[in-house]
Amino acid sequence: MIRLANEKDIEQINNLLFQVHKVHSDARPDLFKAGSKKYTNEELKEIIKDKEKPIFVYEIDKKIEGYAFCILINHNNENSLCDYKSMYIDDLCVDKNSRGKGIGKKLFDYVLEYAKKLGCYNLTLNVWGGNDIAMQFYKNIGLKIQKIGMEKIL
């Protein structure tokens, strides 16, 4: 079942946040601190309350097997962009023990339908270089490159 997250889910969400962070810190130890996570519990509580930042969880038998952190973005009255609404997936994770079962695709499809209902023009996300599994997953489900961020280490 996919549903909106609530405060009772924070502990299980944290377990998944650590998994995502490990992928990032393994790929880019120069940028990501090992053993940490993206949000504090207080930050998670605030995000859960924010209707513009829905967190959807995939739950089986009271265990959260995956999540999608989303952000609704309204582009209005910007100098160079047309007015449009966009749904941004800030983070999508499936528990490492549950991957390959279609959970990520189900979460993505759920967010896609949610974004359509809100009248969004597009659904976007970012993938860190080195996260080849995620990159391939997103390509396999039909996402196309919108823009590429590049860097030169000094």
Show the residue positions of the predicted features:
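A short beta-loop-alpha structural element at the N-terminal edge
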Residues: 1-15, 24
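Conserved GNAT-fold acetyl-CoA-binding loop/helix
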Residues: 22-44
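A short helix-loop-beta-strand connector motif used in the catalytic cores of GNAT acetyltransferases and
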Residues: 42-57, 88
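Conserved beta-strand in the GNAT
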Residues: 57, 63-72, 93
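A short, internal acetyl-CoA/4′-phosphopantetheine-binding micro-motif in the GNAT/acyltransferase core
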Residues: 74, 92-99
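Conserved active-site alpha-helix within GNAT-family acetyltransferase domains
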Residues: 105, 109, 117, 129-147
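Conserved GNAT acetyl-CoA-binding A-motif
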Residues: 115-126
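Conserved beta-strand-loop-alpha-helix junction that forms the acyl-donor binding cleft
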Residues: 124-134, 151-154
